[in-house]
Structure formats: C-alpha cells, structure tokens
C-alpha cells in the first residue's frame, strides 16, 4: 500500500475485516486471535486463484485493542460511560475491551451487565444514545472461541453519534439478556437474530421465529448450517448444490 493510498491492496493486512473471536480485558495488551482467513466467493479452497489477482483469499485482519486517546469524541463517550457505570455501581471490568477501527468505536461488554450499560448509555445526559438502530448476529466459525456475537448499533440523536456494543457468546451457552425493555425497537431484530443464529435473548416478550417456519430445524446463518440445495441443469451441464461441488485442489 502506497503512502497516499487509503484502501489496502488485495492480500495486504487491513484489506479484510474479520472480527475478533475471543475477549480480553481492556487493560490486557493481548490481541484477538481469529485463527482463520477470509475466503472468496464460489466455494474457493486453497488459493483457488489462477488470475494473479490475489484477492480471493486474504489474511485475517484483527483490530488490536485501542489505547487512549481514542480520538475525537470517542474519549468523551468512553469517559462518560465509565463515569455513569461507576454511579450505578457497575464495575469498569464489565467493558471487556474497546476497539477503534475504520473510524468506528466498539465496546465489547460482559453480558451480565449488558442492561445496565444500555441504560447508562440511554439515560446519562452526557451520552444520550436514545435509539438502538439495529441488533444483529455474527458467527465467526467453529475455529474461534466464543464464536457467536450479538451486536448492537446505538444512535444518539442528541449528539449525532453512533457506537457499537458487542457481546461474545459460546455456542453451547448462547444466552444474552434481551434489551427490549431498554430499547423497544430491538423487539423484531432480536427475534430475527434468534431465528438466524440461535442466540437466545432471555426476557424477550415473545422470542419466536420471524423468518423461518416455527418447526424449522437449525439456524440458517450459522457457519455450520448445511448449504443444501438441488442440482440445476444449465445447457446440458448439471450444477450440484454448493456443499456437493467437486474440489479441484
């Protein structure tokens, strides 16, 4: 990447946006270890690239824990959050890590204190994150500890700011408190994340599937969910389902 270039070339560190898979406290200097690299489209295995482009398989990019100063208004929000948590008697260790990457700040938080953190972000006059714009899930695959993440995008209409909260979960214990009592807009989004990823939002008023039938087996956006499909004939050639295609490596 050249000195004036802002977008990394394919294959360079920083060109992939894989997320972290494990959590460390904010005071620890250790970095996340993703344990895998990103693959391209069409079921590529190995490099799978004969063009010389080099962008079908990229090294895993893992943003390091951020250190003060975070820059801009990020420090103001972080200071306000920790002060509000102290006033509520919530330990500072409930914020496991802070990451600043691509101009966005993410707070990785302990699920046991998620509701208190959300209330502090919503109600504190210096913060005023009044709206939860979206709730989504991520599955980082079986190679990653705490592979399931519940992600919350919060918006302050008062100060015109956006932040992100993430809670990392074990696939064998995918429970996290529902934030519907704090942010009612999270209702249907938590249902969708439960439906697609199997993350269980404890305390949700009606946690049922919202996209798939009620008797559907499994959660379609998990990495270990079978792709399935039916063979498709096209101009005399048959294209098998993705998980039955031949590997050429």
From Swiss-Prot:
Cell compartments where the protein resides: Cell membrane
Role: NDH-1 shuttles electrons from NADH, via FMN and iron-sulfur (Fe-S) centers, to quinones in the respiratory chain. The immediate electron acceptor for the enzyme in this species is believed to be a menaquinone. Couples the redox reaction to proton translocation (for every two electrons transferred, four hydrogen ions are translocated across the cytoplasmic membrane), and thus conserves the redox energy in a proton gradient.
Protein EC: 7.1.1.-
Record region (Disordered): 1-29
Assembly and interaction partners: NDH-1 is composed of 14 different subunits. Subunits NuoB, C, D, E, F, and G constitute the peripheral sector of the complex.
PANTHER family per record: NADH DEHYDROGENASE [UBIQUINONE] IRON-SULFUR PROTEIN 3, MITOCHONDRIAL, NADH DEHYDROGENASE UBIQUINONE IRON-SULFUR PROTEIN 3
Catalytic activity: a quinone + NADH + 5 H(+)(in) = a quinol + NAD(+) + 4 H(+)(out)
Membrane topology note: Peripheral membrane protein
A molecular function (GO) term: NADH dehydrogenase (ubiquinone) activity
Protein's UniProt keywords contain Transmembrane: no
Name of the protein in its database record: NADH-quinone oxidoreductase subunit C
Cleaved signal peptide residues: none
Organism from which the protein derives: Saccharopolyspora erythraea (strain ATCC 11635 / DSM 40517 / JCM 4748 / NBRC 13426 / NCIMB 8594 / NRRL 2338)
């Amino acid at each position: 990447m050249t000195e004036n270039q802002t977008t990394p070339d394919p294959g360079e560190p920083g060109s992939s946006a894989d997320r972290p898979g494990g959590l460390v406290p904010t005071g620890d200097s250790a970095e996340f270890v993703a344990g895998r690299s990103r693959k391209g489209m069409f079921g590529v295995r190995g490099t799978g690239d004969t063009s010389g482009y080099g962008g079908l398989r990229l090294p895993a990019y893992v943003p390091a824990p951020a250190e003060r100063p975070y820059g801009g208004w990020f420090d103001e929000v972080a200071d306000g959050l920790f002060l509000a948590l102290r006033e509520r008697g919530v330990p500072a260790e409930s914020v496991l890590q802070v990451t600043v990457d691509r101009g966005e700040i993410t707070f990785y938080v302990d699920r046991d204190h998620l509701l208190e953190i959300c209330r502090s972000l919503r109600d504190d006059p210096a913060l005023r994150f009044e709206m939860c714009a979206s709730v989504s899930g991520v599955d980082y695959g079986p190679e990653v500890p705490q592979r399931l993440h519940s992600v919350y995008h919060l918006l302050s209409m008062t100060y015109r700011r956006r932040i992100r909260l993430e809670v990392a979960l074990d696939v064998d214990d995918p429970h996290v408190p529902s934030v519907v009592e704090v942010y009612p807009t999270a209702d249907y989004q938590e249902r969708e994340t439960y439906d697609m990823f199997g993350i269980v939002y404890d305390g949700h008023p009606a946690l049922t599937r919202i996209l798939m039938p009620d008797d559907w087996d499994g959660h379609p956006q998990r990495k270990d969910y079978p792709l399935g499909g039916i063979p498709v004939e096209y101009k005399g050639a048959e294209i098998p389902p993705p998980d039955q295609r031949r590997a050429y490596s």
